[in-house]
Amino acid sequence: MAKFQPKVQDEGRDDGLREKMIAVNRVTKVVKGGRILGFAALTVVGDGDGRVGMGKGKSKEVPAAVQKAMEEARRNMVKVSLKNGTIHHNVTGHHGAAVVMMAPAPKGAGIIAGGPMRAVFEVLGVTDIVAKSHGSSNPYNMVRATFDALVHSTTASQVAAKRGKTVEDIFA
């Protein structure tokens, strides 16, 4: 079973990125001679200003698995547009059986989200958001569904550009 451990990892890197470990699982591979034990880690990395990435790593030791996951998260970063510490509009993300619904929140509301979603929002730089998950509570699926929702959120200027209109026409 996954252990939720959203704690900040500090390995002395000075790249200005926030790192959080979401889950560490003990995994086994059954071979002719018995079982081979190992660990799988799930982590997220963000700059606190709209860039976030997730990674997973496996190794026979926990620190090595976490390190691999952090490196993969750094390689897989995506840019998300934020507005005053929240998202622009309601958005839904899916991955497997996990469904994540997010809504912008007023200033001072804080991060109203549970489990792995909270860790993603903290490293992303979101300060006010309301999020709810349905279906699967698997941390990996929840993080992927959160990323799906964040990547599919758009700004008013992006919508206006797609429609060939001005931003004022969109809000009229």
From Swiss-Prot:
Give the molecular function GO annotations.
rRNA binding; structural constituent of ribosome
- Record keywords, A-Z: Ribonucleoprotein, Ribosomal protein, RNA-binding, rRNA-binding
Alphabetized InterPro entries for the sequence: Ribosomal_Su5_D2-typ_SF (IPR020568), Ribosomal_uS5 (IPR000851), Ribosomal_uS5_bac-type (IPR005712), Ribosomal_uS5_C (IPR005324), Ribosomal_uS5_N (IPR013810), Ribosomal_uS5_N_CS (IPR018192), Ribsml_uS5_D2-typ_fold_subgr (IPR014721)
Look up the record and give one Gene Ontology term from the biological process aspect. translation
Annotated TM spans: none
- State the oligomer form and interacting partners: Part of the 30S ribosomal subunit. Contacts proteins S4 and S8.
The written remark on domains in the entry is: The N-terminal domain interacts with the head of the 30S subunit; the C-terminal domain interacts with the body and contacts protein S4. The interaction surface between S4 and S5 is involved in control of translational fidelity.
Recorded hits in NCBIfam families, A to Z, give: rpsE_bact (TIGR01021)
Q: What does this protein do?
A: With S4 and S12 plays an important role in translational accuracy. Located at the back of the 30S subunit body where it stabilizes the conformation of the head with respect to the body.
Q: What is this protein called?
A: Small ribosomal subunit protein uS5
Question: What is the originating organism of this protein?
Answer: Verminephrobacter eiseniae (strain EF01-2)
